[in-house]
From Swiss-Prot:
Residues 2-41 are annotated as: Interaction with UBE2L3. Residues 2-116, 165-172 are cytoplasmic. Residues 42-76 are annotated as: Interaction with ITCH. The modification N-acetylalanine is found at residue 2. One of its GO terms (cellular component) is endosome membrane. A motif (PPxY motif 2) lies at residues 64-67. It is found in: Endosome membrane; Golgi apparatus membrane; Synapse, Synaptosome; Cell projection, Dendrite. It is a multi-pass membrane protein. The PPxY motifs are required for E3 ubiquitin-protein ligase binding and activation and for ubiquitination. This is NEDD4 family-interacting protein 1. The chain crosses the membrane at residues 117-137, 144-164, 173-193.
Length: 221
């Protein structure tokens, strides 16, 4: 019995020392592995990033805009003001004086008129004299109507000059004043020709200016 206890006491220190040695080896290996798996320090990453971005700047790549510039949007009022300024012509009031190449459509035909309006105002001014002239000239807005009124009034003036000159109801009215008779006669003839010739020119305007990009239209009555 004593021998067994002595042998057991001799074996226990040997086992304890061997177990202690293995435990020390494992503890010494764990710090080495933890040191190998640890991330690099932040300072080294910052230095590498700075070097990379310096290389990007030196290579000529454009810098991205700042956050304030990229996220700043115009307000609704500013956007509407910019849109309104973009639609304002550089020279205001000039487009109204011009008619485009392809703009001789129905609207311009209403401004120019047709032969029916010309003949209507012509006979109104011819039959009703100055009353018909003023009515036809003021009530019509087309070139045909106004030129017809001018032409009809000129022919009406010639008619009344001839009536007064050769009528027996006005004896001696132009005695000694034949120059005045010729003045009114020539004036009426010029008015008649002016209205007729100008209307003929206006009718040919769509064909004459069809090849021009911009055409200024001005009616002088």
């Amino acid at each position: 019995m004593a021998l067994a206890l002595a042998a057991l006491a001799a074996v226990e220190p040997a086992c304890g020392s061997r177990y202690q040695q293995l435990q020390n080896e494992e503890e010494s290996g764990e710090p080495e592995q933890a040191a190998g798996d640890a991330p690099p320090p932040y300072s080294s990453i910052s230095a590498e990033s700075a070097a990379y971005f310096d290389y990007k700047d030196e290579s000529g790549f454009p810098k991205p805009p700042s956050y304030n510039v990229a996220t700043t949007l115009p307000s609704y009022d500013e956007a509407e003001r910019t849109k309104a300024e973009a639609t304002i012509p550089l020279v205001p009031g000039r487009d109204e004086d011009f008619v485009g190449r392809d703009d001789f459509d129905d609207a311009d035909q209403l401004r120019i008129g047709n032969d029916g309006i010309f003949m209507l105002t012509f006979f109104m001014a011819f039959l009703f004299n100055w009353i018909g002239f003023f009515l036809s000239f003021c009530l019509t807005t087309s070139a045909a109507g106004r030129y017809g009124a001018i032409s009809g009034f000129g022919l009406s003036l010639i008619k009344w000059i001839l009536i007064v000159r050769f009528s027996t109801y006005f004896p001696g009215y132009f005695d000694g004043q034949y120059w005045l008779w010729w003045v009114f006669l020539v004036l009426g003839f010029l008015l008649f020709l002016r209205g007729f010739i100008n209307y003929a020119k206006v009718r040919k305007m769509p064909e004459t200016f069809s090849n021009l990009p911009r055409t200024r239209v001005l009616f002088i009555y």
